[in-house]
């Protein structure tokens, strides 16, 4: 019996996959009416120089005030916010699609998730990347993964 309470049509494994590529395919599947669960979000990667990536996310977290824009620090929140950016989340269709997506740290399901085509880190010759878990630690998130 799986620990997850969300009954997903598709389980996607984000381990060693490029976050943006996974997020775009997950958003597309959600818009098509499928319920999607993304597992191992803390091990998804963003390509590029670590200093630039961390600086970009620190800037996003610092923007706003007590009432203003909130940007997540945890890996699952960052991943879900990325998916939201690829959906028309201000329209009914986009809201429904966004509600049909769950992002998890680790894998609460009994079966392993599938790796989506074209998302694996193996496709790049670039060896510069940083995982979402490392970004979250730098941003000051409590490490629970």
From Swiss-Prot:
GO terms for molecular function: mRNA binding; rRNA binding; structural constituent of ribosome. It comes from the Archaea. Keywords: Ribonucleoprotein, Ribosomal protein, RNA-binding, rRNA-binding. The keyword RNA-binding applies. Pfam families: Ribosomal_L13. PROSITE patterns: RIBOSOMAL_L13. One of its GO terms (cellular component) is cytosolic large ribosomal subunit. One of its GO terms (biological process) is translation. Part of the 50S ribosomal subunit. Interacts weakly with proteins L3 and L6. PANTHER family: LARGE RIBOSOMAL SUBUNIT PROTEIN UL13, RIBOSOMAL PROTEIN L13. This protein is one of the early assembly proteins of the 50S ribosomal subunit. Binds to 23S rRNA. Belongs to the universal ribosomal protein uL13 family. This is Large ribosomal subunit protein uL13. It comes from Haloarcula marismortui (strain ATCC 43049 / DSM 3752 / JCM 8966 / VKM B-1809).
